[in-house]
């Protein structure tokens, strides 16, 4: 959950998000080292006089060719690893289909019979005390903790985007096309997201709420919801 005046990431709740936070820190340290080197060279040029031997030296040309290549490799390797992990969907325990509409989400649990529902934002006038304005919904997405979840995402009208920052998930919902993503929640909790593609007048009013629970609670919830439907 984001906090007021927060500058960093939300607490990671999935392995992918943990990797993304680590890669951000890694890239930030590389950028800091580059900036420090450039500032040092600028200060050196202001203090000391440059000789023609220094400017024309082949060693300098060799260094500023090899050094950027090493920096790019240090950034590319972990980035490619994370991209591969984000695209890898191997034997999910649960498949969820999310369909974007103006301006709400529909969900289908494809592993269950008749387990579907629409998820609307709760208006401020009906919001219970202690709940978050513009983020709460009438039906949450409930998933079992520490289980691979595949999410198939599409839209029924215009472009949308299904995004939950603390899980490291953001996938476009495109009419007539099926996109997919996956995640594993590492702890129980309630994780908030929103549509991240401008989709009309009420774009700001279609939040996403994912609730991670132990498997026994998820089984009880799914049985109860299947009976009600």
Curated annotation (Swiss-Prot):
Residues in the Mitochondrial intermembrane compartment per record: 1-14, 87-229
Listed InterPro entries: CcO_II, CcO_II-like_C, CcO_II_C, Copper_CuA, Cupredoxin, Cyt_c_oxidase_su2, Cyt_c_oxidase_su2_TM_dom, Cyt_c_oxidase_su2_TM_sf
Cofactor, free-text remark: Binds a dinuclear copper A center per subunit.
Cross-referenced CDD domains: CcO_II_C (cd13912)
GO molecular function: copper ion binding; cytochrome-c oxidase activity
Membrane spanning stretches: 15-45, 59-86
Record-level GO BP terms: ATP synthesis coupled electron transport
EC number: 7.1.1.9
Protein purpose: Component of the cytochrome c oxidase, the last enzyme in the mitochondrial electron transport chain which drives oxidative phosphorylation. The respiratory chain contains 3 multisubunit complexes succinate dehydrogenase (complex II, CII), ubiquinol-cytochrome c oxidoreductase (cytochrome b-c1 complex, complex III, CIII) and cytochrome c oxidase (complex IV, CIV), that cooperate to transfer electrons derived from NADH and succinate to molecular oxygen, creating an electrochemical gradient over the inner membrane that drives transmembrane transport and the ATP synthase.
Family under the similarity heading: Belongs to the cytochrome c oxidase subunit 2 family.
Self-association and partners: Component of the cytochrome c oxidase (complex IV, CIV), a multisubunit enzyme composed of 14 subunits. The complex is composed of a catalytic core of 3 subunits MT-CO1, MT-CO2 and MT-CO3, encoded in the mitochondrial DNA, and 11 supernumerary subunits COX4I, COX5A, COX5B, COX6A, COX6B, COX6C, COX7A, COX7B, COX7C, COX8 and NDUFA4, which are encoded in the nuclear genome.
Protein name according to UniProt: Cytochrome c oxidase subunit 2
Species this chain originates from: Struthio camelus
Upper lineage: Eukaryota, Metazoa, Chordata, Craniata, Vertebrata
Gene, per the UniProt record: MT-CO2
